[in-house]
Amino acid sequence: ALHRTTDMFGPIPYSQVGKGSFKVAYDSQESVYRSFLKELEEAVQTLDDYSNKSKEVLPAFDIVYNGDVNKWMRFANSLMLRLAIRVRFADAGLAKEYAEKAVKHPAGLIDSKELAAQMGKGAGLQMKNPLKVINEEYNDTRMGATIYSYLAGYNDARAAVYFVKNNGFKAVRCGIAKSGDAYNGFTRPNVHEDDPLYWMKASEVCFLKAEGALAGFDMGGSAGDFYNAGIR
């Protein structure tokens, strides 16, 4: 979540958080990303040390991978690859270093549908998809006019996948505040209670490797092959 936070806001409190101070300095985005990558590298090493002893850690409490340490290592490497690719225009050397570390680590990456990082099916539990909760229980999530303009303008077939089509689509202009039942007439997101909440899929990893290969990093294949694999 924090890499999305810094991508949106830039500098954020990070290195000094949780150390007992009510006033915390902001870290630069560069230092935050360097910390992210270093911490992921350390996490992979810690998991690697443990994975030689046991393949399951607290499976009853792991709603993502049922305690499978090897799968967590794949996710950590995949997340490292994501962050490395994000900084390639700001620091190509740092991006290349960590992208290649992620790809070449023997634990591997998320490279199949079955390995996707997702919440909702682990540990014998079934969570409610939070987007469904926000949509139905909070009753304030509807199709925005901006995305409708894109989808309708390009006659994009995905509109009926992203949203519930009842007698067409009706979008609300972003920034308009309505109350009570006023939202009910607008189109709802097409999400179900038992839909998994994905953190990362194999398709994203393929596209990340394609971008890395395009930048000249050693990703173990060509940009075109990885790109086509992501589409498939």
Where are these regions (language model features)?
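Structured, solvent-exposed acidic/aromatic patches
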Residues: 1-232
